[in-house]
């Protein structure tokens, strides 16, 4: 909007001929006009730091505040009443801008150390991968895009190992056994041995590559099947450790812990630290009632999460793990009303409650991320799980087990709802995530039902 259009507005008419306004830099006049209109729209008698902070969040952040301060100094000098709240909001935004978190984007560049590039694989392997991808795209085999990518990465790791050890890049018993020994003895970048589930996934992917390519003898694939049985037995021990962690969690303390963190936010003098604590509280409160996998970091208002009928709801959302399946239903998830104030707190930050509707609307229009660092960068993919690990000693995957604990205490029929909520499509998955408390609840319910039957027949 140019100067003439701005000064033609009714609220500028008394001062339209002012030399100060006529000579003020256009950017400053535009900022001043925007602030005046914001003040009128939201019935602000006197600007507060919260008013200025919200205006800045809706209009470009620190740059908008800097320009507005310059405009105030030009128009009214250092005596301008709005300078104090503008500077207070500037200090808050500056503190958040200085925050440096571990962001999801851009990905760090790294040199491959234990993997080949896919173009360095043998030509026959590359041809097999191409055919597998084409068959997947034609619907002839069921293989999620993420799993195809993982299979390719595991194949590159296997190829690197063979090359480094002077072995032919091929599939045979000797090579696979040598690779197994390597995988079960090497350590990750964090200095720990690979988890059984990781090794199982590696050899499962290699088995799938051989199976889908239809170029390798069935006897070799059966050898891998036998190995995978052993690996899954080892994985069961790790699963039992997960349930040990679950047994140590009193589910009735999860939400109180989230409320405690949110309640203590005001004790942090730095606005960036307050933002971080709100993130942590939300990361604890919401997943038990909507147990997504590693998807929380990617949720956005408007695109995925909308405010509808008094509730934050997922709209046309398909869970990552099963969204590739034809006819897969959208996930009917939402944020339970008992915890939606954690999402409200993420939107409001330190600002007045009267701006909640405005911020909800803008968040949907601009597709703000649900989780974001104080400086506006995206959180890491495993952010929510890291918060759970810090607070409860286990990742957010435990939430799916918590769901089964709860629904089992209701009835066996309720477990179907639990399966839908957890996006599980098989009884095998349900069993894997069912802890001892849930099983005990099911046995108790069955015992009561049998007892009722005996009572009815006076046995």
Please annotate each region the language model reported.
Residues 217-218, 278-315:
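Short, charged phosphate-coordinating catalytic segments
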Residues 299-339:
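Conserved tyrosine-mediated DNA breakage-rejoining catalytic core shared by Y-recombinases
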Residues 252-294:
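Basic, Lys/Arg- and aromatic-enriched nucleic-acid-binding interface segment
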Residues 1-233, 239-240, 416, 440-443, ...:
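Charge-rich, intrinsically disordered N-terminal extensions
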Residues 332-403:
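Active-site/catalytic core of tyrosine-dependent DNA strand-transfer enzymes
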Residues 394, 398-425:
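C-terminal catalytic core of tyrosine-transesterase DNA break-rejoin enzymes
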Residues 421-452:
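Catalytic-site neighborhood detector that most strongly recognizes the C-terminal catalytic loop/helix
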Residues 234-263, 325-341:
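DNA breakage-rejoining catalytic core of tyrosine-based enzymes
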């Amino acid at each position: 909007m140019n100067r003439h259009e701005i000064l033609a507005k009714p609220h500028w008419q008394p001062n339209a001929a002012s030399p100060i306004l006529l000579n003020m830099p256009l950017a400053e006049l535009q900022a001043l006009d925007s602030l005046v209109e914001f003040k009128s729209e939201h019935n602000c008698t006197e600007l507060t730091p919260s008013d200025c902070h919200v205006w800045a969040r809706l209009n470009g952040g620190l740059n908008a505040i800097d320009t507005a301060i310059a405009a105030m100094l030009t128009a009214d000098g250092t005596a301008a009443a709005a300078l104090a709240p503008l500077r207070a909001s500037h200090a808050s935004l500056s503190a958040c801008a200085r925050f440096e978190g571990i962001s999801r984007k851009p990905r760090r560049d790294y040199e491959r150390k234990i993997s080949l590039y896919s173009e360095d694989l043998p030509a026959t392997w590359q041809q097999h991968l191409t055919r597998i991808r084409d068959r997947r795209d034609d619907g002839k085999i069921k293989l999620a895009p993420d799993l195809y990518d993982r299979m390719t990465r595991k194949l590159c790791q296997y190829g690197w190992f063979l090359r480094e050890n002077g072995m032919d890049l091929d599939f045979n018993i000797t090579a696979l056994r040598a690779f197994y020994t390597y995988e079960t003895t090497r350590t990750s970048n964090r200095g720990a041995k690979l988890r059984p589930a990781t090794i199982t996934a590696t050899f499962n992917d290699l088995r799938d590559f051989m199976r889908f390519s239809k170029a390798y003898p069935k006897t070799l694939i059966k050898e891998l099947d036998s190995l995978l049985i052993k690996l899954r037995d080892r994985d069961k021990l790790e699963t039992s450790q997960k349930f040990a962690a679950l047994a140590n969690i009193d589910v009735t303390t999860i939400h109180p812990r989230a409320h405690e963190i949110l309640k203590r936010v005001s004790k942090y003098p730095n606005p960036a630290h307050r933002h971080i604590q709100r993130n942590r509280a939300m990361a604890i409160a919401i997943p038990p009632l909507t147990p997504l996998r590693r998807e929380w970091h990617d949720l956005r208002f408007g695109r995925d999460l909308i405010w509808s009928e008094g509730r934050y709801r997922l709209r046309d959302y398909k869970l990552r793990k099963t969204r590739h399946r034809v006819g897969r239903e959208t996930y009917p998830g939402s944020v339970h009303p008992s915890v939606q104030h954690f999402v409200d707190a993420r939107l409001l930050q330190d600002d007045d409650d009267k701006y909640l509707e405005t911020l909800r609307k803008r968040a949907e229009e601009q597709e703000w991320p649900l989780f974001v660092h104080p400086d506006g960068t995206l959180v890491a993919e495993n952010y929510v799980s890291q918060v759970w690990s810090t607070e409860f000693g286990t990742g957010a995957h435990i939430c799916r087990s918590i769901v089964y604990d709860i629904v089992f205490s209701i009835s066996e029929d309720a477990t179907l709802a639990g399966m839908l909520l957890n996006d599980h499509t098989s009884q095998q998955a349900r069993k894997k995530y069912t802890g001892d408390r849930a099983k005990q609840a099911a046995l108790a319910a069955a015992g009561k039902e049998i007892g009722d039957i005996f009572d009815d027949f006076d046995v």
